[in-house]
Amino acid sequence: MDHRIALKPNTPLCLSNDSGEMIHCIIKNEIGRGGSCIVYEAVRITDTGDQTLYRIKEFYPYKLHISRNNNELVPSVHDMDSFQKGQKQFRCDFSHTNRLFYSGDNYSSMTNQLDVFNQNGTSYILSAYSSENTLAAYKPVNLKECITLIKQVVYVLGNIHKMG
């Protein structure tokens, strides 16, 4: 059973990157979980009052003992070192994925990651919103679609592994 506690809908996030740039957004809902993260749909209200939609990936590893205290993630003393190493890897993965996205190949199935932020004792990756269904929700209608999807995933994973 997954013991992680997701951010609640309407939770405000004020994210700042290493350059001091800030973005204010509001969590709309959780859309997925992986072994190292929880993914949310979020919204930012522009100066004109329009909504800009984002995907936010929160570094929150499943296997570690981490509590959430007022939206702050607090790893146990025993897991602090593993958490910090994982967080560093999370940030490196952002850079690898960004290089892959802009490598000139067409990765229509990849999200455009915009920036990485540290906040609430963890890291967040901000991505451009995609109106496409998530991979978990995608239901191929036939074997040909399944094979096409698998080939795309294998191709991207192969390139990720080549990058280290």
Model-predicted regions and their roles:
Residues V43-S95:
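ATP-binding glycine-rich loop module of kinase domains
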Residues M1-M22, I26-N29:
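Juxta-kinase regulatory segment immediately upstream of eukaryotic protein kinase catalytic domains
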Residues Y155-G164:
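Protein kinase catalytic-loop region centered on the HRD/HxD motif
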Residues Q119-T134:
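Conserved short submotifs of the Hanks-type protein kinase catalytic core
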Residues K28-G35, V39:
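Protein kinase glycine-rich loop
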Residues Y102-S123:
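Short beta-strand micro-motifs within the conserved protein kinase catalytic domain, predominantly
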Residues L149-I150:
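Activation segment signature within eukaryotic-like protein kinase domains
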Residues T134-L143:
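AlphaC helix of the protein kinase catalytic domain
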